[in-house]
């Protein structure tokens, strides 16, 4: 634990003034990399120590659970665990949940309500839209005519809720929360209001509340029972520029009890307008709270000076922005690098090559996981993914394959929700998992009867079981038997683990579910190839349930299993589980929005074209500019920016019909040329020393600037296998495997001919002869142009377009990845988006082509030929070929 007030010694003058502010209302405007989390943490410690405020009398609102946990850990390091554990901290939603659990009865909430997460709300809305397809009334017809997707419909409802509009039982019109301004009338179309009413009724019936409801219900609670926050002395809010109208209204209600307010934010980083964030809240606070003191943090500890100069030149284009500076703590002689390319594909391959060049030039100084590629939207990653995969650059996508979104995990969570409160959405998901002869037709009929009779899905199931409700004229004994078996399993689990007198752990409950429904056997029947991977995920859930249980047991060792279960489900709904990555080095591909608050030593900002940034569908030019500013300020040492003139391939479908692109207006003008360089970065000891100082890395390997010029590129005199030769062999291998049916390889190869004699008659056996040849690594022998041309002809003649995509995946990894150390990561990236046939053949086989062959010097001397891949890889390639019907 740090000594009393020692945390103040690590602050600069600006930070110290902010931490010790005596003002009742304080705004701390913190630029990127200026230490806002440190200041917010120190401010909390200062209030607790110097102002003698009790920890339970402070509210700290953040925008992510990760940020809340980080602040709590830092407070714990300063003051100890006992004080930190008493803090009321978390996201607005999690804080609302804590108060609603404790005081929700004052606004009519039951004791066992649960949070509906994204999957639940999607399922509810899908069922509503499906039912409206059959309804015969004008409003239903109007909704059908709009052809809404579940997400579109939910977005409409969120818009209504974020403006404070409520559905009230028995009322056709929406009501506005007292104290809020009336929203535009166009928001409240008959169709939107009816969808909202039906959706909210479905939530109520299932005893659920969605995330928007948490904030609305918290407002209603504070208005009806303000004494529940009477003890709060100080409210601290992080990322204030991202607060919505509803969240700001909550802050005002919390402050009615004479609480002080400290906010930390940066108007230059307000990028969430599409989530109803209101940048105007900063100015509104100064108007609503008289005497608000505005303080600035302008010392940047993250980025090199040239990066900040470029970022400020971009954000300063907004003439309405209050002028404020940003001073760097790091000197660098390297300006941000800018390149303009003919096509998006050339841009992508250049980025992939440059990444390999950086890592190869700066050993032990810059690694793959130090590098990020940040794009305006996820739809722009296809070309980048493909280029990285072809050149053997390992990468990860941020925000995909979330743990709690995996099918097997969703199944088990649904079972837990059924046991917790008979949630209809979860019942519908698991009633036929594993299969029980209860198909979609039966489920739809049960849903219909539930809605017709005003019953919950669970109540209807029991009525059907007791034959009080008939789903068809004939008595379906098989269905009834299956239904009774399902209900019996649920009852058995309740009696065994949740009834009074039993104190089971959550892992006991989960293992009981797995045993009762024979889930492992179900996974085996479903897909033997994926069962082990899925079962590992299931066991991970069991382990996580125990970890979370321990936290609640520490708070209350007498906690019942049912309350423990409800808390566990709430944690799952509140926390956006991040995918657990291995320790392997990987480049990060992320959207600009997802990169907020993060940093990397090296950042690439590609696709900086008009209609991409600013986005063609955005009506807020200033927010788009702020988004680019946020992206630029993620970089610590090296920043690369790039644009292209035209698009090719599938990427073209998303852009202008003429495929012609203009550079982003944010990068135009003579002024911008002052802050960027277009020549290639030359790595040397001086540059490495500057980078090392910025990153705090004092020791690293020998710096060697790798540039690579065509076929003459080489490093330390080592010769490497010709990429075009590899590609020919792989194409030929695929062609041969397509014909290989009965004969063994040896029998097939009896009549070999020398493929290098290009004037010889080409036959099927020529192909085998060709791809078995190995280019001597230690010689200067090159493949002759006639031989290369002949192989192209074979590939074009015998490789049909239908199967080429699959072969291309093999070509991509084998032809472009000669470094054995990259093999593992490339295998993980197999199956990423392919190029067209002409692109691959031309790119990999044409002599002197700059997109692939240029940087052969980046490979290592332990190069292996394409056919010498690990057995597991060959097996996987074979499977892919069989799937594509090539074998």
UniProtKB/Swiss-Prot annotation:
Which residue stretches, if any, does this entry annotate as coiled coil?
A: none
Entries under InterPro entries matching the protein: DExx_box_DNA_helicase_dom_sf, DNA_helicase_UvrD-like_C, DNA_helicase_UvrD/REP, P-loop_NTPase, UvrD-like_ATP-bd
From which source organism is this entry? Answer: Schizosaccharomyces pombe (strain 972 / ATCC 24843) (Fission yeast)
Lineage of the organism: Eukaryota, Fungi, Dikarya, Ascomycota, Taphrinomycotina
> What is the role of this chain?
ATP-dependent DNA helicase involved in DNA repair at least for UV-induced lesions. Also aids the recombinational repair of camptothecin-induced collapsed replication forks.
Q: Which domain of life is it from?
A: Eukaryota
- GO terms for cellular component: nucleus
- What is the designated name of this protein? ATP-dependent DNA helicase srs2
Q: What EC number(s) does this enzyme carry?
A: 5.6.2.4
Where, in this chain's numbering, is ATP bound?
Answer: 33-38, 302
Q: Which residues form the UvrD-like helicase ATP-binding domain?
A: 9-304
Gene3D superfamilies xref list: 1.10.10.160, P-loop containing nucleotide triphosphate hydrolases (3.40.50.300), PCRA, domain 4 (1.10.486.10)
Catalysed reaction(s) here are:
Couples ATP hydrolysis with the unwinding of duplex DNA by translocating in the 3'-5' direction; ATP + H2O = ADP + phosphate + H(+)
């Amino acid at each position: 634990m740090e000594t009393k007030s020692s945390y103040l010694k690590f602050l600069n003058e600006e930070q110290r003034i902010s931490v010790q502010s005596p003002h009742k209302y304080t705004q701390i405007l913190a630029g990127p990399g200026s230490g806002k989390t440190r200041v917010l943490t120190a401010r909390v410690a200062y209030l607790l120590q110097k102002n003698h405020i009790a920890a339970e009398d402070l509210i700290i609102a953040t925008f992510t659970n990760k940020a809340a946990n980080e602040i709590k850990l830092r407070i714990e390091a300063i003051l100890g665990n006992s004080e930190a554990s008493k803090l009321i901290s978390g996201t607005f939603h999690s804080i609302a949940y804590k108060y609603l659990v404790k005081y929700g009865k004052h606004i009519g909430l039951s004791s066992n309500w649960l949070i509906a997460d994204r999957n639940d709300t999607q399922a509810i809305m899908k069922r509503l839209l499906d039912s409206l397809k059959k309804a015969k009334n004008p409003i239903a017809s109007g909704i059908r005519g709009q052809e809404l997707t579940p997400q579109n419909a939910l977005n409409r409802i969120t818009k209504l809720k974020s403006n404070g509009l409520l559905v009230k039982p028995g009322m056709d019109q929406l009501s506005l929360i007292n104290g809020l301004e009336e929203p535009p009338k166009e928001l409240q179309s008959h169709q939107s209001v009816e969808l909202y009413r039906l959706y909210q009724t479905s939530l109520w019936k299932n005893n659920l509340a969605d995330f928007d409801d948490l904030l609305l219900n918290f407002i209603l609670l504070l208005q009806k029972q303000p004494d529940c926050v009477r003890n709060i002395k100080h409210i601290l809010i992080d990322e204030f520029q991202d607060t919505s109208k509803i969240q700001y209204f909550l802050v005002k209600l919390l402050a009615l009890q004479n609480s002080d307010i400290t906010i930390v934010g940066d108007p230059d980083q307000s990028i969430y307008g599409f989530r109803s964030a209101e940048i105007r809240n900063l100015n509104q606070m100064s108007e609503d709270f008289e005497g608000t003191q505005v303080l600035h943090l302008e010392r940047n500890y993250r980025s090199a000076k040239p990066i900040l100069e470029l970022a400020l030149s971009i954000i300063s284009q907004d003439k309405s922005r209050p002028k404020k500076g940003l001073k760097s703590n790091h000197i660098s002689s390297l300006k941000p690098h800018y390149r303009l390319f003919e096509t998006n594909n050339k841009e992508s391959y250049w980025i992939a090559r440059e990444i390999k060049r950086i890592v190869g030039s700066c050993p032990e100084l810059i690694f793959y996981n130090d590098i990020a590629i940040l794009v305006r939207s996820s739809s722009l990653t296809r070309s980048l993914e493909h280029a990285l995969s072809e050149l053997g650059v390992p990468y990860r996508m941020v925000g995909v394959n979330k743990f709690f979104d995996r099918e097997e995990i969703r199944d088990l969570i649904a079972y837990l929700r059924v046991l917790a409160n008979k949630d209809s959405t979860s019942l519908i998901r698991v009633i036929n998992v594993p299969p029980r002869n209860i198909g979609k037709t039966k489920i739809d009929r049960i849903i219909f009867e539930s809605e017709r009779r005003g019953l919950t899905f669970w109540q209807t199931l029991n009525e059907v079981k007791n034959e009080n409700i008939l789903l068809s004229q004939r008595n379906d004994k098989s269905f009834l038997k299956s239904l009774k078996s399902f209900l019996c399993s649920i009852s058995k689990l309740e009696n065994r683990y949740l009834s009074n007198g039993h104190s089971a752990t959550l892992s006991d409950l989960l293992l009981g579910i797995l045993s009762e429904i024979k889930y492992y056997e179900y996974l085996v029947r479903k897909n033997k190839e994926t069962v082990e991977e899925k079962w590992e995920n299931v066991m991970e859930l069991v382990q996580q349930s125990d970890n979370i249980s321990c936290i609640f047991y520490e708070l209350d060792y007498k906690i019942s299993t049912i309350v423990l279960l409800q808390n566990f489900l709430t944690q799952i709904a509140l926390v956006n589980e991040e995918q657990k990555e291995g320790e392997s080095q990987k480049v990060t591909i992320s959207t600009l929005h997802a990169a907020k608050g993060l940093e990397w030593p090296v950042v690439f900002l590609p696709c900086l074209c008009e209609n991409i940034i600013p986005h063609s569908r955005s009506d807020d030019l200033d927010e788009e500019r702020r988004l680019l500013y946020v992206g630029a300020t993620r970089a610590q040492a090296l920043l690369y920016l790039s644009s292209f003139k035209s698009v090719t391939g599938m990427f073209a479908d998303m852009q202008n019909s003429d495929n012609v692109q203009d550079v982003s207006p944010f990068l135009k003008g003579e002024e911008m040329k002052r802050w960027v360089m277009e020549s290639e970065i030359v790595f040397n000891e001086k540059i490495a020393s500057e980078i090392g100082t910025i990153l705090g890395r004092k020791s690293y390997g020998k710096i060697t600037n790798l540039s690579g010029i065509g076929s003459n590129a080489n490093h330390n005199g080592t010769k490497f296998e010709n990429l075009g030769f590899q590609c020919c062999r792989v194409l030929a291998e695929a062609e041969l495997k397509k014909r290989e049916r009965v004969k063994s390889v040896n029998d097939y190869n009896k009549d070999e001919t020398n493929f290098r004699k290009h004037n010889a008659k080409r036959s099927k056996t020529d192909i085998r002869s060709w791809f078995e040849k190995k280019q001597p690594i230690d010689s200067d022998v090159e493949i002759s142009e006639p031989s290369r041309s002949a192989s192209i002809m074979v590939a074009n003649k015998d490789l049909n377009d239908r199967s080429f995509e699959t072969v291309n995946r093999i070509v991509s990894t084998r032809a472009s990845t000669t470094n054995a150390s990259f093999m593992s990561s490339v295998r993980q990236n197999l199956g990423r988006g392919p190029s067209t046939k002409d692109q691959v053949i031309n790119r990999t086989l044409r002599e002197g082509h700059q997109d692939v062959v240029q940087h052969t010097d980046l490979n290592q001397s332990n190069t292996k030929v394409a056919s010498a891949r690990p057995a597991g890889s060959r097996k996987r390639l074979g499977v892919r070929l069989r799937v594509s019907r090539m074998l």
